[in-house]
């Protein structure tokens, strides 16, 4: 039994999209996926990408992925990582694959001088919450995620700017 973690390549576009769809199904959010394989490939494999993906392979086959991008802390004056997605196929859970994906990303943070890793987890996903706690992550109950998207974003974005303020 062997585990390998590697950066996604353009040849992985279909795989990354399939894993995103599997994650959405697990999270009961399939109805939210409106991206395409092309959309993901365009950002992941751009000449200067801003979004990155690591693929986990178990015995040479795809086992999971981590999709992430840089964020920034004005308090620390440095970048960090926002882990947008992490997913291990259900049949392969419990083998340390998710932990290996997280460890690789943590090592990259340390090597680059980035100060933290952040992620969001659904409140019903107790196994994931316990896993994050077990590796030292703090669940920040005093913060809430706010999202402006879709029609609300369009409506707000079309407001006229305030002049002379």
Regions found by a protein language model. Name each.
Residues 4-16, 29:
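A short beta-loop-alpha structural element at the N-terminal edge
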Residues 56, 94-99:
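Glycine-rich acyl-CoA binding loop
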């Amino acid at each position: 039994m062997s585990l390998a973690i590697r950066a996604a390549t353009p040849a992985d576009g279909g795989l990354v999209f399939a894993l995103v769809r599997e994650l959405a199904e697990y999270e009961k959010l399939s109805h939210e996926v409106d991206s395409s394989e092309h959309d993901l490939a365009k950002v992941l494999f751009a000449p200067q990408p801003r979004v990155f993906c690591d693929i986990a392979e178990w015995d040479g086959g795809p086992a999971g992925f981590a999709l992430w991008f840089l964020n920034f802390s004005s308090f620390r004056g440095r970048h960090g990582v926002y882990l947008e997605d992490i997913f291990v196929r259900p049949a392969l859970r419990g083998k340390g694959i998710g932990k290996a994906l997280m460890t690789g990303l943590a090592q990259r943070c340390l090597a680059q001088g980035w100060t933290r890793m952040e992620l969001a987890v659904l409140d019903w996903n107790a196994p994931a919450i316990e896993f994050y706690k077990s590796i030292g992550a703090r669940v920040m109950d005093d913060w809430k995620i706010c999202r402006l998207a879709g029609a609300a974003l369009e409506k707000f974005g079309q407001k006229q700017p305030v002049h002379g303020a």
